[in-house]
């Protein structure tokens, strides 16, 4: 079956949000909705998700599901805003509980913080099947970038989160907690078992100069030409390349705000006694920054102003 897919690009975080529609029933799912966030002022805004909501309303579409491919570290989720406006069940992979447990400890969350994934309406397990209208959908666990990463196969459309990028960009970093380059390679090869004509939709596109941003590729295109993971690249070669590359990457700009909100299902931390919610930035003693610090802030706090893409 062939769902209709409309994709919305969030320029500040290079993120694609996808609206997936069963044309027979006008039921929909929204994959990876984005909340605008200005780090300097600590201000969240709903401009991006309002465009998605307006599209759904204008097309008279009803979202059954609001699907997260993982707890993102580079943008904040707008899932609660979308659910409040139009309904739909929020869902993520069951591995979120491991991610919640890690960050609850690493960032010293409030004692009442739950690490059972109950901030989401549903936790998917590998191979689980569901529907969007009459469209068959299946969950494929794709760990490697993060422990909770999943891909959604909806009809002939595959939504891979950060598991793969466009072929000329490659693959996602694996230096976050629970990340593993070997696991990512195995996840990619599992996706490559799907038919080559399967449409593949990415969560991010860091387009090289001279190319427009793209949301869609295919399994066949990825197998032929992905610069990191095309056919013929061995597991050992991928691990060596990915590990070396990750050592050169800085932490994402919105790392700390994003993980604190996203592991809570897109909801900010509880307000403190003055009625204001705060986002933490851990700090360690000043030392010379070393090459290859990468995302080490997740294990040893580094200034959150360090920047880097997800590739």
State what each model feature region is:
Residues 31, 62-71, 90-94, 142-144, ...:
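Active-site neighborhood of phospho(di)ester-bond hydrolases with catalytic His/Asp-centered motifs
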Residues 35-43, 47-135, 224-225:
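Active-site HxH/HxHxD metal-binding segment of metal-dependent hydrolases
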Residues 2-62, 151-160, 167:
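Conserved beta-strand hairpin/beta-sheet module of binuclear metal-dependent hydrolase folds
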Residues 5-8, 19, 126-154:
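Core dinuclear metal-dependent hydrolase active-site scaffold
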Residues 20, 32, 70, 82, ...:
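Divalent metal-coordination and catalytic microenvironments
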Residues 2-3, 186-199, 203-311:
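Accessory terminal helices/loops
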Residues 13, 37-38, 71-76, 97-100, ...:
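Active-site environment of divalent metal-dependent phosphoester hydrolases
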Residues 171-194:
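Active-site-adjacent loop/tail segments of enzyme domains
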């Amino acid at each position: 079956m062939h769902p209709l897919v409309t994709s919305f690009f969030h320029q500040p975080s290079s993120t694609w949000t996808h609206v997936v529609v069963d044309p027979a029933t006008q039921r929909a799912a929204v994959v990876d909705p984005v909340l605008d966030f200005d780090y300097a002022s600590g201000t969240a805004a709903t401009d991006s998700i309002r465009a998605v909501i307006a599209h759904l309303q204008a097309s008279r579409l009803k979202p059954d599901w609001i699907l997260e491919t993982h707890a993102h570290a580079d943008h904040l989720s707008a899932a609660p805003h979308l659910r409040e406006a139009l309904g739909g069940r929020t869902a993520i992979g069951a591995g979120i509980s491991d991610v919640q447990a890690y960050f609850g400890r690493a960032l010293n969350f409030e004692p009442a913080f739950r690490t059972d994934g109950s901030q989401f309406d549903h936790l998917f397990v590998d191979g689980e099947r569901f529907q969007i209208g009459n469209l068959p959908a299946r969950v494929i666990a794709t760990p490697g970038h993060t422990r909770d990463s999943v891909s959604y196969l909806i009809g002939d459309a595959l939504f891979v989160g950060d598991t793969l990028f466009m072929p000329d960009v490659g693959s996602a970093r694996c230096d976050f907690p629970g990340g593993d380059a070997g696991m990512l390679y195995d996840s990619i090869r599992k996706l490559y078992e799907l038919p080559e004509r399967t449409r593949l939709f990415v969560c991010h596109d860091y387009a090289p100069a001279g190319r427009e941003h793209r949301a869609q590729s295919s399994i066949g295109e990825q197998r032929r030409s992905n610069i990191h993971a095309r056919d013929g690249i061995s597991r050992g070669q991928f691990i060596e390349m990915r590990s070396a590359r990750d050592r050169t990457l800085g932490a994402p700009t919105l790392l700390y705000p994003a993980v604190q909100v996203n592991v809570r299902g897109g909801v900010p931390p509880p307000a403190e006694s003055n009625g204001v919610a705060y986002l933490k930035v851990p700090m360690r003693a000043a030392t010379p920054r070393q090459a290859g610090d990468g995302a080490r802030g997740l294990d040893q706090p580094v200034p959150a102003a360090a920047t880097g893409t997800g590739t």
